């Protein structure tokens, strides 16, 4: 099916990896990293822009570990940690509402258009975006309904940095990537030329969009415009990685649920994977679940399945009942985000995966 996706121009390049009961049962690499002559065949070492998978591979596990360490309480109000985030209903927003998208905050804003060009991808740009986020007024009463929002994860990243006094990408490396041996799951910090050079050295990146705003083809810098304005490291986007390392992080979540020897406390994973009780919500704390009817996870995954999608054409689904992890990484936004045929391709692929490895 992946080769059919290439032939049908769903994406120029992609990787599919499936793990069952702790072992890799399928790993395949298809197409090219780019359509231009600089493109090379996709391989196990190809690094993809993971987009919103950042939420479940970096931000959410960092929040869980902060809770595990006793440094955060999910019922604490965000304004207690971010004093500027007050008034107009903001005071009622608890950390768990940022995680399960029930804060009422807007889905997304074009903040990058309001950052002075000289501040883009600098510490000043990060500060400017954060100020605009804290000025947002909830569009619904906090805790009343689910409204998917990148803004909540911008705030969660800021809160983590406030609590620990360290950049979130450093926390990610020290608490997650290094302990798990994940050398190919990383951020490209555009605020620091030295750090970004280290992140890029020796790595092959799948190209994303020929960006009209930036006026160039994006290869090794974050696709999401707001994250770019913030310097490449965001709570909502910015992570790059290979299919193997994305699957390994998924395995860390699953192992923590199934054993008492995981990186995360079992009871906290159970709490984070508990589906919201809000009517119509498919969310847990940080994660999504397959929606009823036409789901991007297709048909066949178990009722406890959790995961997430990424705008660039990425997804991760974890089915605890069959101990199955399915990773799909593509660069479907190359050369343009206007190609949305992955919305038809992805459910069919995941249905086939579920049928291939039944419970």
Where are each of the predicted segments found?
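Short, P/G- and charge-enriched loop/turn segments at secondary-structure junctions
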Residues: 3-5, 47, 142, 301-306, ...
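Short, glycine/proline-biased beta-turn/loop segments that scaffold the active-site neighborhood
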Residues: 73-88, 179-180
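Short, surface-exposed loop or secondary-structure junction motifs
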Residues: 30-34, 88-303
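Active-site SXXK
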Residues: 2-3, 16, 22, 49-75, ...
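Short, conserved catalytic-motif segment at the N-terminal edge
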Residues: 1-50, 71-73, 135, 224
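Short, surface-exposed beta-strand/loop micro-motifs that present aromatic residues
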Residues: 312-325
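Catalytic tyrosine of NAD(P)H-dependent dehydrogenase/reductases that use a Tyr as the general acid/base
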Residues: 48-51, 146-148
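Generic C-terminus detector
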Residues: 334-358
